[in-house]
Amino acid sequence: MGEAALAVVKLGGSLLFEDEGSLKEGYVRGFLRELREYLAESNGRVVVVVGGGRYARNYIQLGRRLGVNEGVLDYLGILVSRLNAATMYAAFYNSPPLIPETLLDVHKLLASGLRVVFMGGLQPGQSTTTTAALVAESLNGSLIIATDVEGIYTDDPKRNPAATLMERVSVEELRRMFQREQVAGEYRMIDVLSLNVIQRSKVKVFVLKGDPPGNIFRALRGERVAGTFIEA
């Protein structure tokens, strides 16, 4: 996708968590190692938006059973995503975490000289993918969405072995696929609000398989990686 001066990387929770909810220590170590190598060889800056993952869903499901309303449940998910981001910040910088709570906070942290910002969600009613799209729009950056499949498929590749990877797809085509409920395994990752932001701002978006984490940084370097470009 061309070497990126400023990139936003959305890390899906499926990459960070085991099925039972524990963090994948090996993956986090590998991601941070690749990130350090990328920064050492480039002038790039990166905003890492971390999802809540299984841990957030556990809290949300418990809260729902306890009668908590959906807006408050969203906020619980945001807090968990920020805790995930704080853990990665602490491991990367070995200092108390500075986690943005607004878009302005992101700008301030980058202006202070930080080359990497770690963050979770920003507000209820918004997925962390939408958050990542808004950050990319605000910073005029590119967006990489890292998930557990190689991109967007014609059907769910985990259920349909005949599904094929789409190398390019337009926002309008994705909208039609949403209406047919055929966005292969991506409903949880690319929602309609995210598509609205991508379309209005013409953000460059590439969806790829984030495991191994080297895939993400190969894409940031402009190397060819399997995945899907979303065209506004």
UniProtKB/Swiss-Prot annotation:
PANTHER family: URIDYLATE KINASE, URIDYLATE KINASE PUMPKIN, CHLOROPLASTIC
Subcellular location: Cytoplasm
Family matches, as InterPro entries: AceGlu_kinase-like_sf, Asp/Glu/Uridylate_kinase, Uridylate_kinase, Uridylate_kinase_arch/spir
Protein name: Uridylate kinase
One Pfam family in the UniProt entry: AA_kinase
GO biological process, any: 'de novo' CTP biosynthetic process
Activity modulation comment: Inhibited by UTP.
Family: Belongs to the UMP kinase family.
